[in-house]
Amino acid sequence: MPKHGKKFRNALEGTDLQERFSVEDAVGKSLGAAFAKFDETVDVAIRLGVDPKYSDQMVRGAVTLPNGLGKTVRVAVFCKGEKQAEAREAGADIVGAEDLVAEVKAGNLNFDAAVATPDVMALVGQIGRLLGPRGLMPNAKTGSVTFDVAKAVSELKAGRVDFKVDKAGVLHAPLGKASFGPEKILGNLKALLDTVNRLKPSSAKGTYLISMAISTTMGPGFKVDMTQVKKFLEG
């Protein structure tokens, strides 16, 4: 059994971590348990009723959170010609093609998200093994492989979150900073859940949203009473 510090124990005093809460209470308790000296990120973990080993049950997408993420997102754009100027004007931090691929191969991955135009994807594929494990590989399904680089950059800067289920069928996503307060976090969560629901595979049978937990960077996970989720989304 891992030992936790005094601040952690104090934050959980009187709380049963096996209890399930309404969405609003789970967020509130998570924020109340944020004790770190830095502004912790609020995260959600959602277990879906899908089997990702089947390609038609892979849930993957993107959502622009209405209240952003509360952090500066460094965006790299792989493109050529006039698209480079378009990307820079939209606020891209790093722009290039062969030169940018060479930088990544050298170990310089000082960006948080990447966009690529379709005509350079063969080039970007050379560094897929470096980008993929970090969640940085551009993907058409999330809108990061596109000729409309200005739109993609603007969305990423505004707080777009790319997500996909892992091998266990669990989807992880950030919802913003603890300093946002409950209203903004709940607004971001609603936008995420609406998007995830729209992406439900037709081949997925039974319950789709199985379980959910809200946590902060250093805090515990507070489980959500899934019978309350529909009410939250309709509210």
Curated annotation (Swiss-Prot):
One GO MF term: structural constituent of ribosome
SUPFAM superfamilies reported in the protein's UniProt record: Ribosomal protein L1
A GO biological process held by the record: regulation of translation
Gene3D superfamilies linked to this entry: 3.30.190.20, 3.40.50.790
Pfam family membership, one: Ribosomal_L1
Ribosomal protein is among the record's keywords: yes
Gene Ontology CC terms, in alphabetical order: cytosolic large ribosomal subunit
Keyword terms: Repressor, Ribonucleoprotein, Ribosomal protein, RNA-binding, rRNA-binding, Translation regulation, tRNA-binding
Record flagged with keyword tRNA-binding: yes
Assembly and oligomerization: Part of the 50S ribosomal subunit.
Biological function: Binds directly to 23S rRNA. The L1 stalk is quite mobile in the ribosome, and is involved in E site tRNA release.
Matching NCBIfam families: rplA_bact
Similarity remark: Belongs to the universal ribosomal protein uL1 family.
Protein name from the UniProt record: Large ribosomal subunit protein uL1
Species this protein is from: Desulfovibrio desulfuricans (strain ATCC 27774 / DSM 6949 / MB)
Primary gene name: rplA
